[in-house]
């Protein structure tokens, strides 16, 4: 059971990293298309990650 939880945690972590990288690339492409206009957007990933970790290891 612990191995399954570790595997799921690893998949969640890698998925979050790849999603972040894709969003950064998309934002860079949008910035190039808009002529250098910068759009600031704050992303908050830590809350869902902490709750997922708590549910995996807590019960």
Swiss-Prot record:
It is found in: Secreted. The keyword Signal applies. Residues 1-22 form the signal peptide. Keywords: Amphibian defense peptide, Antibiotic, Antimicrobial, Cleavage on pair of basic residues, Secreted, Signal. The keyword Secreted applies. InterPro entries: Frog_antimicrobial_propeptide. GO terms for biological process: defense response to Gram-positive bacterium; negative regulation of nitric-oxide synthase activity. Residues 23-42 form a propeptide. Expressed by the skin glands. It holds the Pfam family FSAP_sig_propep. GO terms for cellular component: extracellular region. Belongs to the frog skin active peptide (FSAP) family. Temporin subfamily. Antimicrobial peptide. This is Temporin-CDYe. The lineage of its organism: Eukaryota, Metazoa, Chordata, Craniata, Vertebrata.
